[in-house]
């Protein structure tokens, strides 16, 4: 999504962007994935000479160009900040094998980020801190602005909206559990996205007796997502240690407050508690209090949504491009 938004912004500013998707051969074929990026030709595309390269995620920073800015959104987190969690989930034999792979990956990533790119820019302070800890790289932060979409506010209906991949790190279950803490209130949730936890989340809603108050949309197209953002009371985005989280700025652009958690990483850098959303503890009870405040007080939801919109207005693509292209 960020790559497409960046390409659209470059085109709007008079540049001629080429969006190149580097190969990804999956978790078990990292060597092939890195080699494919290293050998991807970005010097000329369709007969055009390329003046600048902006890479985003691992291992696209392995492509080679003399004017190469890495605007990093994440490395392979299982081998970095999520290593303790990942290591605990595998057998000791696999842990030995993966430890060697992790050390190799750190060495390769460190060399590429120090030697293969002209400049490294982080998409959040959370990423900036990880880069400093892993590679002793000092970076500036350029937050991705909202995509150039049709964001609008069509009201503040009585539902909380959540949109993300449905995997454990996104902690969508916190919203479902929060609804169970609020049986006396007419609070509904709409959840968009798919992933490995989809079935478990639906089963959780049934077991807690809130299945009639949670609507699972599955994976949705952009118009449906924009409509939900435009009409919801607020957005609930409570991941664990998120790199950045585009959902936050999309909610702000729709004049909607964001509920997030103190350990959510990137979103907590943008959400101002009681200014553009609510920052709570990563517990169902704490999320329930935040949901109740916004559902019971529409004026508060509107005020915090306005605060988010004011923040989004300062995050422009013109400014981001000026920072990224100053190689």
Q: Which residues are covered by each model-predicted region?
A:
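Aromatic "clamp/platform" in nucleotide-sugar-dependent glycosyltransferases that forms part
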Residues: 240
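Conserved donor-binding/catalytic core segment of Leloir-type glycosyltransferases
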Residues: 150-170, 176-181, 190
């Amino acid at each position: 999504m960020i790559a497409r938004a960046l390409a659209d912004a470059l085109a709007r500013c008079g540049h001629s962007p080429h969006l190149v998707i580097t190969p990804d051969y999956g978790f078990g074929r990292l060597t092939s994935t890195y080699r494919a990026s290293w050998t991807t030709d970005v010097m000329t595309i369709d007969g055009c000479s390329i003046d600048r390269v902006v890479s985003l995620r691992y291992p696209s920073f392995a492509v080679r160009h003399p004017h190469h800015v890495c605007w990093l959104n994440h490395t392979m987190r299982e081998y970095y900040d999520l290593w303790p969690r990942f290591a605990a989930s595998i057998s000791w034999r696999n842990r030995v094998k993966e430890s060697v792979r992790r050390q190799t990956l750190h060495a390769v990533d460190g060399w590429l980020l120090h030697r293969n790119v002209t400049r490294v820019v982080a998409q959040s302070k959370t990423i900036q801190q990880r880069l400093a800890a892993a590679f002793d790289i000092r970076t500036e932060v350029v937050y991705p602005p909202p995509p150039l979409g049709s964001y609008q506010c069509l009201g503040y209906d009585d539902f909380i909206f959540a949109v993300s991949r449905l995997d454990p790190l996104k902690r969508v279950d916190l919203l479902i559990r929060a609804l169970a803490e609020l049986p006396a209130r007419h609070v509904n949730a709409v959840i968009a996205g798919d992933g490995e936890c989809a079935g478990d989340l639906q089963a959780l809603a049934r077991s807690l007796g809130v299945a009639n108050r949670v609507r699972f949309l599955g994976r949705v197209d952009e118009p449906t997502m924009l409509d939900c953002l435009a009409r919801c009371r607020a957005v609930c985005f409570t991941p664990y240690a998120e790199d950045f989280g585009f959902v936050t700025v999309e909610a702000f652009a729709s004049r909607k407050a964001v509920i997030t958690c103190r350990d959510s990483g990137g979103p907590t850098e943008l959400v101002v508690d009681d200014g553009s959303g609510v920052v709570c503890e990563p517990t169902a009870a704490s999320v329930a209090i935040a949901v109740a405040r916004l559902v019971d007080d529409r004026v508060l939801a509107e005020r915090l949504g306005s605060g988010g919109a004011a923040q989004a207005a300062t995050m422009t693509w013109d400014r981001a491009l000026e920072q990224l292209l100053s190689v």
